Amino acid sequence: MFLHLMKALLKGGGVVNGYQVWLESFYNSIKGKAMRLYIIGNGFDIRHGLPTRYKHFKSYVAKNDKELYDAIEEYIPAGDEWNELESALGEIDYELILQNSEMFLVTYNTEDWSDAYHHDYQYEVDKITRMLSARLKEQFADWVKGINIADAYNSEQYIPPIPRESLYFSFNYTNTLQQIYAVPDAQIMHIHGNCSYDEDLILGHSFRVEKSLNPYIGPDQDIRIAEAYDSIDKYFGNTFKPSEDIIKEENVFFSSLKNVDEVIVLGHSLAEVDGEYFSEINKSIQKVLDG
């Protein structure tokens, strides 16, 4: 993310102090000019001819991991846009997962009972939920890293002017701004990660689960069913996008927005799943406007 990049750019005084020094120098260099913040979404890359739609990712998964593709099709009711996928991760049909796995829930008094039956049901539920969380994210990261930014050079859809003397808040994982418009890394906040750096890329929903989805917790519940619900709960935790924590981690960047005069949105739908970021941006800028 942002301070991750600054570690490579700044020496001495600590990363945060170094970034604050850099900001002061940056603001002095553009004194008298309008200070803009560009919010960049996937539509920006799409306009440059890059295959970054959700349907392109699904095609990649269909080719490289058919089992995962089938699970996505069955349990995640997403449309064609990224914000729909992220929202759908929080609307996974977990009841269908439990229902489809019931063939492994063998009754205890069956004649051919095996000790393996103690674990088969919850194992199947856990396998599906892990596939739709960890494995999906692994395939996603591999796909993003394989996107060829050079394809954007051939695009007739450049968006002039993209001034370098601005700050950029990007939801994209690609380096289109850097490679096509020569915007320095230090002026770009890749809020969900950058595919060029060895870090986790963030993909998730905004549905915070406050308590277990298990409706019948108690000593009389079949332990296999209880453990299956544990896997469901873990899924929602593992696919949750911790926007609040990310904002705290990147507080230096958000504090820097106090000098912004204008916000320009390019290629983002302002979807609810990213609402916390927009609220924080608005709050950071509003502090100045309110005096």
Regions found by a protein language model. Name each.
Residues L213-L257:
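Acidic, metal/cofactor-coordinating or nucleic-acid-engaging core segments within structured domains
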Residues R36-Y69:
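N-terminal ordered "arm"
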Residues L5, G12-G13, W22, F26-H48, ...:
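SIR2/sirtuin-family catalytic core signature
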Residues L50-T52, A182, L203:
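Short aromatic-enriched loop/helix-cap "lid" or pocket-rim segments at secondary-structure transitions
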Residues S196-S206:
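Short, charged, surface-exposed secondary-structure boundary motifs
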Residues H56, V61-G193, D198, F254-S256, ...:
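Active-site periphery "cap/insert" segments of enzyme catalytic domains
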